[in-house]
Every structure is written in C-alpha cells, then in structure tokens.
Amino acid sequence: MKLCHFEAGLDQPLFLISGPCVIESEQLAMDTAGQLKEMCAGLGIPFIYKSSFDKANRSSTKSFRGLGLEEGLRILADVKAKIGVPVLTDVHEDTPLDEVAAVVDVLQTPAFLCRQTNFIQNVARAGRPVNIKKGQFLAPWDMQNVVDKAREVGNDQIMVCERGVSFGYNTLVSDMRGLAIMRGTGCPVVFDATHSVQQPGGQGATSGGQREFVPVLARAAVASGVAGVFAETHPDPACALSDGPNAWPLGMMRELLETLKEIDALVKQRGFIEHKLMKA
C-alpha cells in the first residue's frame, strides 16, 4: 500500500509512527519531530509524526486534553512544512474531518470507536489513509468487518492497528496471534507498542502504564511480522501531560529502533511459513 512517501506492507521495511501523545506546545512538537526524523533517516526507517490536538477519551475531565483543533492543526501544519515529515492525528465523531484532512497525511480512529459504522465510513470518505485501531474489546478476526465498512465507501488505504486486549480490570495483554490473523484483511498491520503497556484507569483519575515492557512487546510484534510500529514518545515521560507512564523515552528511541530494524529485516527475509497453514 502506498502510504505518504513510501510503500507499506509485510513485504516492505518496517515504518514508524511516533510522537508525543498530545500536542503540548509548538516547541515540543518541533523538537520531537526533528529528532525522530533525524533518527529514522539515519536508520532508513520511513517515519510519520503523530500527535493529538484533542484527547477526548481521557479518564477524567481534569486531565489535559490538548490545545484544541485550531491551534493543534496549525502546529501540525508547521511540523509538516518546517520539519518535512508526514503527520498523523486522531479524529473523533464531532471532528470536522475535511478541515483535518486538509492538513494531515493520515487520519487515525480511536480504538473505542472502531464499531461505529457511520464514524468509520465518514473518516474513510475524507480522502486520506486511515489507521484504524482495534478495540480492546474486539477479536482480531472481527476487524475484517471494520475494514469492509471503510472499503465500502471507496478507500483502500486502510491500516489496522493492535493496541492490546482487555484482560480483567485496568490491564491489557497482547496476543501476537492477532497480528497474523489481521493480515488476512489485506491491510498493513501496525503494532502499538506503547498503548499496549497501558493500565487503563489504573491510577484512579488517570491511566497507568509499564513502559519498561515496551521493547519486550515491540520485539515480539516485529518478530511476528508487522508493517509498522506505533510508539508514543516524550523527552521526559514523567512530565508528559498525557499517557506519560506508557510513553517511551525519546533519548532511548534510537536504541530500540536499531533492534527492531534488525529483527524486521531477518523475519521478512525468511518469510512467514504460517501463511501456508492459515486460511486465506
């Protein structure tokens, strides 16, 4: 699949979607985008910058949601123009999709909204590639129905993203079989390595997380076979205004990417023998 300036798929090198969870300031956006671009260029990893103008699903109304649509889009447009990278942001049911699609390169749908038919189809109609996050409550094979809804309105530039499965209260687990199953949709599969270690609502009014396990799950996912990795990052996760406990430190990102790139090259060179046994 053609995605921004590169090809994305199981037969293509790993790509990265990364950035702070939420747009905190223009300076932070520019700094992180610039550093990530430099890292990825040095490693030969295609890169899409991600950050949100509004986090509508925060645990509490007291939590920071973002800078809002107008200011957020202005900053994303500046990142795109001045840093020279494609940008992705998430949208919601009340988002003016045409306005957002005029600025960003990729639209992302939140996991909680993956079953909302009208929403998925409206986003797909906006004319941009879409990264559809699988709900924490959804079986991997049920993503075929979600993809079909998006394709029905004429959008073939669809990615599916695994971000963990609810496992009791305040806990997520990652079933790597789901990555192989979702390949059956014919869409590039992305693994969200940072939200997969989130502990939703685990700190009462905020979510917790176990960022120390980000590389563990990222290595496992890339070894299983994915088109891309999604990993939110922050120069100082302890001070991040959203999802800090599961954000990967920016200063440690290059080391992680080096490992993932090596694993990706090996498994894609060898191929995926499981396809001989899985139903088409």
Curated annotation (Swiss-Prot):
Reactions listed under catalytic activity: D-arabinose 5-phosphate + phosphoenolpyruvate + H2O = 3-deoxy-alpha-D-manno-2-octulosonate-8-phosphate + phosphate
A GO CC annotation given for this chain: cytoplasm
Molecular function as annotated in GO: 3-deoxy-8-phosphooctulonate synthase activity
Keyword Transferase attached: yes
Pfam families: DAHP_synth_1 (PF00793)
Record localization: Cytoplasm
InterPro entries in the record: Aldolase_TIM, DAHP1/KDSA, KDO8P_synthase
Major subcellular location class: cytoplasm
HAMAP family: KDO8P_synth
NCBIfam families, A to Z: KDO8P_synth, PRK05198.1
PANTHER family: PHOSPHO-2-DEHYDRO-3-DEOXYHEPTONATE ALDOLASE (PTHR21057)
Protein name (record): 2-dehydro-3-deoxyphosphooctonate aldolase
